[in-house]
């Protein structure tokens, strides 16, 4: 007799049956193997706090990056060490529960928790169908043939033991899937040599990457090129080719010294040296750096390239220094500037609760300093009950010299027994402005209240 098989059109049926068997096995073994653990058929709640994520004007940000979606996976260990899905949930901007920390309920017991922020739209359907941790670990981010653009996908992981007797708190640090590259070049040559940069390339940027951080090598590459007409000044200041305000964002490219010749990311500079065409080559993050991952690029890091042309030639005539920094580290020598208030009047608005009413606004003047050419923006974190009064500046040049007047008012009449609060802060390039560098901890928010009647 010929056997008949039922084929589910989604291909999920065999995986669902396997998941059911593994889950039943995990439940049966829980008390026998771990008598002190809460039973896994009990429901518990965990609050996931995303580090360095804050609400600004009703939106969630991690540093300068806007977060629009957060997906949480909770996995439990099944038979033979296979981690299976216990619960997953997608949080989206605009929903009432889209706030940090995020709350999710799952079954009690030891759990591994993964967070995906700003998931690519192309992966949403695949992520919806995840049943095993291995599927998530193997998932590839979308292929690219050009720089990665914001909003960046971010991922993080934590472990926690969920207990039905109380809400468990867990913290997760998010890592961006991208790395960033900046490049400055200067000339230090004998005599009166004249050099003009005509083209710069960053070769062998990874075309693909795992969604989660891993050790896999790229299977394809793309090249970045920028034609330019940039004269250098001998023994003068460096010229920014890839500026700090507009870095090159790429996937991680992980490997080793042994495979560097066909895989490692490479810098190529084309120039006219006293009118003669020449070309310079150098590996990004080679053995001369102090990093622990030579010839590789890792996600959530900043690769600051400083090149010095010393003479005509190819490899040895371009001295390239790669400084590897965490994404959020500021380097003041490189022109990164933590924005700050150059002057605020009256200064007391920084240190006190500033009272406003429906009729009378808070008014003060401010000068803000950021990097050259940058602009500041003012934000109230309670825009439903407070706003900027007429004549108030809400953005401006962060040049440190222009004086702006800020006016904040209450949008509603004073209520009986109702106290309303908001924080006012300024940002430059997504970074909060420090109000006074001499106060520890350095303040960034101005507190404003409306008293109740």
UniProtKB/Swiss-Prot annotation:
Pfam families: P_gingi_FimA
Gene Ontology molecular function: any one: host cell extracellular matrix binding
Keyword check for Signal: yes
Localization of this protein: Fimbrium; Cell outer membrane
Residues spanning the signal sequence: 1-28
Lipid attachment residues per UniProt (S-diacylglycerol cysteine): 29
Changes seen on gene knockout: Triple mutants lacking FimC, FimD and FimE show strongly decreased interaction with host CXCR4 and impaired down-regulation of the TLR2-mediated innate immune response, resulting in strongly reduced survival of the bacteria.
Keywords annotated in UniProt: Cell outer membrane, Fimbrium, Lipoprotein, Membrane, Palmitate, Signal, Virulence
Subunit record text: Fimbriae are composed of a major, structural subunit and the minor components FimC, FimD and FimE. Identified in a complex composed of FimC, FimD and FimE (in vitro). The complex interacts with host extracellular matrix proteins, including fibronectin and type I collagen. Interacts with host CXCR4.
Note from the entry: The name (major fimbrium subunit) does not indicate the abundance of the protein, but is derived from the greater length of the major fimbriae. In strain ATCC 33277 and strain ATCC BAA-1703 / FDC 381, major fimbriae are 300 - 1600 nM in length and about 5 nm in diameter. In contrast, minor fimbriae are only about 80 - 120 nm long. This length difference is observed only in a small number of strains, including strain ATCC 33277 and strain ATCC BAA-1703 / FDC 381, and is due to a loss of function mutation in FimB, a protein that restricts fimbrial length in other strains.
Function according to Swiss-Prot or TrEMBL: Minor component of fimbriae. These long, filamentous pili are attached to the cell surface; they mediate biofilm formation, adhesion onto host cells and onto other bacteria that are part of the oral microbiome. They play an important role in invasion of periodontal tissues and are major virulence factors. FimC, FimD and FimE contribute to interaction with host CXCR4 and thereby down-regulate the TLR2-mediated host immune response.
Protein name: Major fimbrium subunit FimC
Species of provenance: Porphyromonas gingivalis (strain ATCC 33277 / DSM 20709 / CIP 103683 / JCM 12257 / NCTC 11834 / 2561)
Source organism phylogeny: Bacteria, Pseudomonadati, Bacteroidota, Bacteroidia, Bacteroidales
């Amino acid at each position: 007799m010929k056997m008949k098989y039922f084929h589910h059109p989604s291909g999920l049926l065999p995986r669902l049956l396997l998941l059911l068997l593994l889950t039943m096995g995990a439940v049966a073994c829980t008390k026998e193997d771990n008598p002190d653990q809460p039973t896994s058929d009990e429901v518990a709640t965990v609050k996931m706090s995303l580090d360095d994520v804050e609400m600004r004007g009703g939106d969630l940000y991690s540093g300068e990056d806007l977060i629009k979606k957060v997906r949480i996976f909770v996995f439990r260990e099944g038979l033979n060490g296979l981690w299976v899905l216990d619960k997953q949930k997608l949080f989206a901007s605009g929903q009432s529960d889209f706030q940090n920390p995020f709350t999710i309920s799952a079954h009690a017991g030891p759990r591994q928790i993964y967070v995906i922020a700003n998931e690519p739209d192309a992966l949403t359907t695949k992520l919806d169908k995840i049943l095993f941790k291995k599927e998530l670990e193997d998932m590839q981010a979308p292929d690219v043939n050009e720089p990665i653009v914001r909003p960046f996908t971010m991922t993080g992981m934590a472990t926690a033991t969920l207990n039905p007797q109380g809400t468990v708190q867990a913290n997760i640090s998010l890592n961006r899937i991208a790395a960033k590259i900046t490049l400055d070049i200067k000339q230090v040559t004998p005599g009166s040599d004249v050099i003009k940069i005509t083209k710069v390339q960053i070769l062998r940027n990874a075309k693909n990457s795992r969604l989660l951080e891993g050790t896999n090598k790229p299977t394809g590459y793309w090249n970045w090129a920028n034609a330019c007409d940039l004269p250098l000044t001998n023994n003068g200041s460096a010229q920014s080719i890839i500026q700090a305000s507009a870095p090159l964002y790429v996937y991680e490219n992980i490997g080793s010294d042994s495979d560097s010749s066909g895989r490692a990311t490479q810098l190529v500079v084309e120039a006219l040296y006293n009118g003669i065409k020449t070309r310079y080559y150098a590996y990004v993050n080679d053995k001369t750096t102090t990093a622990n991952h030579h010839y590789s690029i890792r996600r959530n890091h900043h690769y600051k390239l400083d090149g010095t042309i010393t003479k005509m030639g190819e490899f040895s005539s371009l001295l390239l220094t790669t400084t590897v920094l965490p994404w959020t580290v500021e380097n003041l020598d490189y022109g990164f500037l933590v924005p700050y208030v150059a002057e605020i009047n009256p200064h007391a608005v920084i240190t006190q609760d500033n009272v406003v009413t429906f009729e009378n606004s808070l008014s003060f003047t401010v000068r803000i300093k950021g990097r050259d050419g940058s602009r500041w923006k003012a934000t109230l974190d309670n825009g439903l009950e407070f706003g900027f009064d007429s004549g108030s500046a809400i953005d401006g040049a962060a040049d440190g010299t222009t004086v702006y007047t800020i006016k904040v008012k209450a949008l509603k009449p004073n209520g009986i027994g109702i106290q309303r609060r908001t924080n006012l802060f300024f940002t430059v390039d997504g970074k909060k402005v420090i109000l006074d560098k001499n106060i520890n901890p350095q303040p960034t928010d101005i507190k404003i209240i409306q008293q109740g009647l």
